[in-house]
């Protein structure tokens, strides 16, 4: 229920923000009508298509057992162990090392890994990463994360459109009730990206700790995930995954780490904190497994 409530709250926040932006930028009743229409379309899109959007953003390609036997069989084996339907299996092209899961429920889920992660992680560490992503699916985190990413992406996109329009004759008609509000335009361009970041931060960082713990329980090997996280953080510094920042929270690890502002506004806890939590969990595992 907590995830469902948070998802609904995010959708409501998006609706209110889009309507407010339309009102201040376009003006009057026209702005309200356009805002309501945009809110309705975006809500439906984020609810039903957010997984497809996430996969498209990262250019993830579906793979079969014959195309990626090692990965496919690993996802299949862990899904059976977790007693969930097997999600779709995807590979993201490129040598950056990362992974994510998406989908509104276990029946409509997907797990995606990069080519880079397949190249650098040994068997036990890759298994721990897959188990982490499956735990997100089990906990229904994937719905909340995907919707939040779509919401934040929509806000950022709208801010960019408003910014571009300033270079091409302005926005808002002269025949509406308010004629467009210059202050509203400025606030949209400046504050909308910040609002997108706040929405990302609304997704609790404890979700990552929970997924880490779920991986440890599923594999019985918390130290493998700890090693994988350290390896992935080092790899991300060398080859970051370039994509819309709104979809950063879907990844198992921040694609760009070690920067003050990046850590301050990160939707992930620090890798050091996650590793320490896993090492503590290792001592407790026989009693909680």
From Swiss-Prot:
Family annotation (Gene3D superfamilies): Metalloproteases ('zincins'), catalytic domain (3.30.2010.10)
Transmembrane segments: 8-28, 29-49, 151-171, 183-203
Pfam families: Peptidase_M48
CC per GO annotation: plasma membrane
Binding site for Zn(2+): 132, 136, 208
Membrane topology reported for the UniProt record: Multi-pass membrane protein
InterPro entries reported in the protein's UniProt record: HtpX_protease, Pept_M48_protease_HtpX, Peptidase_M48
Cofactor: Zn(2+)
Cofactor binding description: Binds 1 zinc ion per subunit.
Alphabetical UniProt keywords: Cell inner membrane, Cell membrane, Hydrolase, Membrane, Metal-binding, Metalloprotease, Protease, Transmembrane, Transmembrane helix, Zinc
Family stated for the protein in its record: Belongs to the peptidase M48B family.
Family annotation (HAMAP family): Pept_M48_protease_HtpX (MF_00188)
Protein name (Swiss-Prot/TrEMBL): Protease HtpX homolog
Organism: Trichormus variabilis (strain ATCC 29413 / PCC 7937)
Top-level taxonomy: Bacteria, Bacillati, Cyanobacteriota, Cyanophyceae, Nostocales
Gene that encodes the chain: htpX
